[in-house]
């Protein structure tokens, strides 16, 4: 286990039902904020049109994924719609040690495992709700990524996903994309001011005390 006191960044877990906007929000936030990075998951699902290995996901075969599980490479992993997704330990630890804040676009299973991991003191969790079920269904249809059968399955699973909303610290209704995006960035800024998130604060307080001693001795 890596000493978490060396970490300088925080982890932002964003979850939502499929179609509620978590991936679009996460990508836009990362694009506009150079100190925020995206957690690139490993997955066994096939790449979609336009996706590149190592950008949206690290695409692997199931045998390779199982080997990574055996070798304890993941902070968390879960099966979603018949495909496996996992978060790499070494990738996350490197980004945190480089001072990056990291956004996770994960379902409630992944969110729970990250919050319960050894990195839990660094985690901030956000759940995104759709403005209505009708809007959620329309978004799934309009993105043209899935056939009708898969859309129906995603709608069924969405109810289960939404049932976990109360496990998250911050809840937002995605009825205004730009507003929600700005609010998430504000949350990140505020959370980094919390005492337990400012891991270099004890060193700074020690420095102030040394300066006090020097000031008193010279007075």
Named regions from a protein language model:
Residues 121, 133-136, 141-163, 178-179:
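Ras-like small GTPase catalytic G-domain
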């Amino acid at each position: 286990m890596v000493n978490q006191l060396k970490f300088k960044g925080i982890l932002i877990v964003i979850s939502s039902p499929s179609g509620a906007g978590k991936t679009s929000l996460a990508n836009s936030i990362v694009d506009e904020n150079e100190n925020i990075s995206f957690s690139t998951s490993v997955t066994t699902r096939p790449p979609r049109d336009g996706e590149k290995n190592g950008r949206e996901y690290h695409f692997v075969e199931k045998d390779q994924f199982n080997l990574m599980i055996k070798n304890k490479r993941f902070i968390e992993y879960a099966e979603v719609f018949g495909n496996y997704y996992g978060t790499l330990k070494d990738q996350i630890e490197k980004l945190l040690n480089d001072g990056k804040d990291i956004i996770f676009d994960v379902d409630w299973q992944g969110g729970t495992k990250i919050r319960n991991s050894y990195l839990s003191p660094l985690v901030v969790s956000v759940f995104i709700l759709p403005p209505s079920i009708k809007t959620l269904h329309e978004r799934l249809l309009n993105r043209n990524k899935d056939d009708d059968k898969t859309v129906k399955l995603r709608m069924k699973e969405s109810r289960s996903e939404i049932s976990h909303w109360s496990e998250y610290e911050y809840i937002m209704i995605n009825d205004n994309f730009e507003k929600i995006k700005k609010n998430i960035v504000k949350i990140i800024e505020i959370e980094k001011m919390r005492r337990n998130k400012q891991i270099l604060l004890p060193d700074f307080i020690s420095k102030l005390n040394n300066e006090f001693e020097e000031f008193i001795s010279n007075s």
